[in-house]
Amino acid sequence: MEIALACDLIIASENARFALPEPRVGLAALAGGMQRLPRQIGMKNAMGMMLTGRHVGASEAKELGIVNEVVPQPELMDAARRWAKEIEACSPMSIRATKQVAYQSLGEANLEKSMQGQYSAVSDLLKSEDFVEGPVAFA
């Protein structure tokens, strides 16, 4: 699950299960799971999973916000490709800027400060053809 938590999106089959089971065997989720899970699903939900090593099924993982979509196993690759096509249809520079701001602003607790932050991908976007052409496409 630690690798999955590092992903931007998760599309899961109905039979997928998620857990950080390390405490059950005297270990700890040292590959980022203990830091990422609380940020993604809130402290109480994360502690409930992390302190018990409890497994959650795909439907509960969707409710908690761990996964974006749950599909039947035979449809998994089609769903992943659909998400990829939707992202691919967007401006690469906009995607880069969105990801940079979203992830870097996690480190700033103050929303106003994070909104005033300087982000290189945003600066690059504002100077790009995408920024000029984008509004024209909406007109």
Task: Please place each PLM-identified region on the residue numbering.
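CoA-thioester-processing core
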Residues: 1-51, 64, 79, 83
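Short loop/turn segments at beta->alpha junctions
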Residues: 42, 57, 72-75
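Interdomain hinge/lid region at the active-site interface
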Residues: 130-131, 137
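C-terminal long alpha-helix characteristic of the crotonase
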Residues: 11-16, 67-116, 123-129
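Hydrophobic alpha-helical segments typical of transmembrane helices
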Residues: 33-36, 45, 97, 118-121, ...
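Short alpha-helical scaffolding segments that buttress acidic/His motifs in well-ordered protein cores
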Residues: 49-50, 98-101, 138
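Acidic, divalent-metal-coordinating active-site segment for phosphoryl/phosphodiester hydrolysis
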Residues: 54-60
